[in-house]
Every structure is written in C-alpha cells, then in structure tokens.
C-alpha cells in the first residue's frame, strides 16, 4: 500500500477530514504545486483550479453551517457522509492505493473513511458542551469553535504532508485537550428551573424554553 511515512501521512489527512471534511483535500491540491508533495496521476484532478475553487467554497460553507447552534446534532449526523468520503479520498491519495487492486482500494476506504468517522465522533463528543455555551451565551462562541476546528484540520493535514509523525501526535494532543476542556465546561452546567434542560450556569435565559434564569 505504501511506505510507513505515506501511511502515517494518510492517517493524518483522514484524521484532518474528520475535523473539517474539505480542508485536507484543498491542502492536497495546494501542496501539489509545491516541492513537498505531488499527487499521483489518478488524483491530479484535486489540484485542478476549478476543483480547488469548489473545495474552497465547501470549506467556507462547512464552517458557516457548523456555526449555527440550531442545526446542532442534525448537522453532526449529516456530516458523517462527506467526512467519510473525504477521508477515503485523502487516504487513497496519500498512499496511491487506488492504482492497485480492488482489495487495496477497499482497505483505503475502510481505513480512511473509518479514521475520519472516528475523529468526527470524538469531535461531536467534545463539541456538545461548546454548543451549549454558544446557545446559552453568544452565537460568536459557535463561530469561534467552527473556525478553531478548521484551524485544527489545517494544522493536522499540513503536518501530515510535511511531517507525518507530527500529525499523529497532534491528533492525539488535540483530542486530549478538547476532552479536558469539554469536561470542564460540562461541570459548569445546571438544570433550568422551569423546563429542566441543561444550561450554562452563567446563562441569562434557557435556550430550550426561552425563560429567564
């Protein structure tokens, strides 16, 4: 399937797709024009100017959608599909396994898509407390969280291309830091005295029933 470094790069790119689906693909297209990375012939389409423009628009749309607290769990569920597909493409592009037999193509799909899905699941567990803060306090918190996820995806995917081992450690580090912060935020939640929904302790109103606290 490829060297150890290319496999590590593939996992890093797929992990980045789990944070934001289209960021790693856009970076793959961009790095294709540098001395640091070259897409295989079957993946050269990713570096097409038209495709990169479309990917750029999709990145912006994904950030905007994730910035809307009202979409919440619906967006989290729907996002599995594009992230699994993006993880598969990124993994296969890094290893070049689509040029091989169907078995290796299937392995790329399982590993790449599975990695992206796993990272997205972790992201969802971390994001829930942030979403409660965004709904209870200010919409800007949701926007900041979404932009932060795009930044993490960019950092992980870029390091996956330039220094693959760093990407693996970065994924673990971001996950641990995120879980720690989300646990801290979860501990600051309280029940709404009117409807019983979970709200941030400093909230002035309940996002579920709209009553003042």
Q: Which role fits each region the language model picked out?
A:
Residues 1-5, 31-50, 90-108, 159-168:
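Helix-coil boundary and interhelical linker segments in multi-pass alpha-helical membrane proteins
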Residues 199, 212-213:
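Cys/His-rich microdomains that often coordinate metals
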Residues 80-92, 138-155, 201-202:
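Small-residue-rich segments of transmembrane alpha-helices in multi-pass membrane proteins
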Residues 55-65, 112-120, 176-180:
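Alpha-helical transmembrane segments of multi-pass membrane proteins
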Residues 192-195, 206-209:
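Short cysteine-rich clusters marking metal-coordination/redox-active sites
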Residues 85-97, 105-125:
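Mid-bilayer segments of alpha-helical transmembrane spans in multi-pass integral membrane proteins
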Residues 60-73, 124-131:
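C-terminal ends of transmembrane helices
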Residues 73-85, 106:
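Cytoplasmic-side transmembrane-helix entry/capping segments in multi-pass membrane proteins
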């Amino acid at each position: 399937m490829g060297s150890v470094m290319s496999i590590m790069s593939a996992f890093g790119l797929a992990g980045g797709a789990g944070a934001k689906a289209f960021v790693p693909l856009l970076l793959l297209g961009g790095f294709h024009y540098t001395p640091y990375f070259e897409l295989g012939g079957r993946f050269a389409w990713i570096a097409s100017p038209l495709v990169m423009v479309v990917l750029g628009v999709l990145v912006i749309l994904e950030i905007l959608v994730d910035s809307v607290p009202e979409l919440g769990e619906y967006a989290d569920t729907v996002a599995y599909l594009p992230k699994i597909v993006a993880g598969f493409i990124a993994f296969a592009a890094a290893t070049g396994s689509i040029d091989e037999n169907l078995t290796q193509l299937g392995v790329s799909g399982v590993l790449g898509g599975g990695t992206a899905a796993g990272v997205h699941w972790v992201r969802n567990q971390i994001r829930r407390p942030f979403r409660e803060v965004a709904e209870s306090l200010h919409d800007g918190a949701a926007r900041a969280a979404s932009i932060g996820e795009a930044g993490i995806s960019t950092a992980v995917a870029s390091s996956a291309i330039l220094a693959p081992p760093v990407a693996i450690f970065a994924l673990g580090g971001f996950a641990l830091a995120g879980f720690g912060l989300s646990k801290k935020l979860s501990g600051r939640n309280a029940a709404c005295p009117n409807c019983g929904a979970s709200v941030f302790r400093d909230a002035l109103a309940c996002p579920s029933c709209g009553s003042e606290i």
